[in-house]
UniProtKB/Swiss-Prot annotation:
The protein's annotated pathway: Amino-acid biosynthesis; L-leucine biosynthesis; L-leucine from 3-methyl-2-oxobutanoate: step 2/4
Keyword Kinase: no
Cofactor(s) needed: [4Fe-4S] cluster
Protein name: 3-isopropylmalate dehydratase large subunit
């Protein structure tokens, strides 16, 4: 039997040959949670009187949603999780100064062919390196922490092929929005999207992480990039580690296929109040903007800050602009490259890796009637603050161009 990437990963994890629709018990390679969900996971373990961990080296904990704590309750939650980490002697703990969980997973932990579960919907981000990564609720994650296993329904595989080279201002967000605009947000329910890149170096890991991150917005069970030379090079660069690639077999059968020609994409936005309300940036041009947010686990990586820096260098922003690299590593690299200095000189507020504005938590909550252009992942009512705010999702080029002009702007139109 020839297998897709999904089938090969889940066959290994379950110890048997699997097919779409099968209900399986799979061994987990990484189990993770953050501050906002972690205390629920711990509560489940406490109520079940099962305070044990299957393998301490395979648990990853990061503080990101409430980092630094904006109120007393947040500080209390983090304090309790720190106590749990200390008592359980967990080595892979990242406090408020390290970064967003999903960025840390691809930088330090996730590998091709792994099964990763975490208590957050954007766990699909780790699919960028070819891992089957899925977000789950606190009870399922607690069970995985205790047993090292989880149950899954093997999803139907859907093949996406990326052809050609993206234009100067096109990145992973435009590919994600292109898929959402064409197929809508509920189409991929029960499916695993496997992305094949014909020219691996034309679509780097930063771009892949953005697309995989948005897989949950497509309602996909997982969104994985087929591992290739870019995968190997990224992991070697970030960790000094050589990896074996897991790839689909020739002739593997897919439910359906779709091809995107990268050189034909335009800068896109998702208009309020849905991720699949996709339009070109030029269709929405001249909409006044109150605040721009560049960052999040969707678009807070080095290439995102390079693009923003290129557009904003030597200019002054015409509206509020908040820029947040997704991890300490990304912040440090962006600082060394001069990108942070360019953004600060342009008038942006820059801070370290926190989820803050994305979930309407802190560091830039949207007010009533405000229009936000954000590189984050969701734009439904109330996501970034007020129910009366309007959030447009975009890639870093549209976000930076909009900050430069004060209204939604295609980067090709910035002088």
């Amino acid at each position: 039997m020839t297998g897709t990437l999904t089938e090969k990963i889940l066959s290994r994890a379950s110890g048997k040959t699997v097919s779409p629709g099968d209900v399986i018990e799979a061994k987990t390679d990484i189990v993770a949670f953050h501050d906002l969900t972690g205390y629920h996971v711990i509560e489940v373990m406490e109520k079940a009187n099962m305070m044990k961990i299957f393998d301490k080296t395979k648990i990853v904990v990061a503080f990101d949603h409430l980092a630094p704590p904006p109120d007393v309750r947040s500080a209390e939650i983090q304090g309790n999780i720190r106590k749990f980490v200390k008592e359980m002697r967990l080595p892979n703990f990242h406090d408020i100064n390290v970064g967003i969980l999903h960025e840390l997973l691809i930088e330090q932990y996730a590998l091709p062919g792994q099964v990763i579960v975490a208590a957050d919907s954007h766990t699909t981000t780790s699919g960028a390196v070819g891992a089957f990564a899925q977000g789950m609720g606190a009870s399922d994650v607690a069970a995985a922490v205790i047993t090292g296993k989880t149950w899954l329904v093997v999803p139907q595989p859907f093949k996406v092929t990326l052809k050609g080279n993206p234009g100067k201002w096109i990145n992973g967000k435009d590919v994600a929005l292109e898929l959402l605009g064409k197929f809508k947000a509920d189409y991929f329910n029960g499916m695993s999207i496997e992305v094949h890149v014909e020219n691996p170096k034309a679509f780097p890991m930063d771009y892949r992480a953005t697309v995989s991150n948005m897989g949950i917005e497509m309602n996909a069970d997982a969104l994985m990039f087929v591992p290739d030379v870019e995968t190997k090079d990224y992991i070697k660069t970030m960790r000094g580690k050589e990896v074996e690639l897991v790839t689909p077999d020739p002739g593997a059968k897919y439910l359906d296929e779709h091809t995107i020609e990268l050189d034909k994409l335009e800068p896109l936005v998702a208009a309020p109040y849905s991720v699949d309300n996709v339009k070109t940036a030029r269709e929405e041009s001249k909409v006044p903007v109150d605040q721009v947010y560049i960052g999040s686990c969707t678009n807070g990586r080095l290439s995102d800050f390079r693009i923003a820096s290129e557009i904003l260098k030597g200019k002054k922003v015409k509206t509020r602009c908040i820029a947040i690299p997704s991890s300490y590593t990304m912040f440090k690299q962006a600082m060394e490259m001069g990108y942070i200095e360019d953004l600060v000189n342009a008038g942006c507020v820059v801070t370290y890796g926190t989820c803050g504005p994305c979930l309407g938590g802190h560091f830039g909550v949207a007010g009533p009637g405000e229009v936000i252009v954000s590189t984050s992942s969701r734009n439904f009512r109330g996501r970034m603050g007020s129910n009366e705010a309007k959030v447009y999702l975009s890639g870093p080029s549209v976000a930076a161009a909009s900050a430069a002009t004060g209204y939604i702007t295609d980067p090709r139109d910035v002088q």
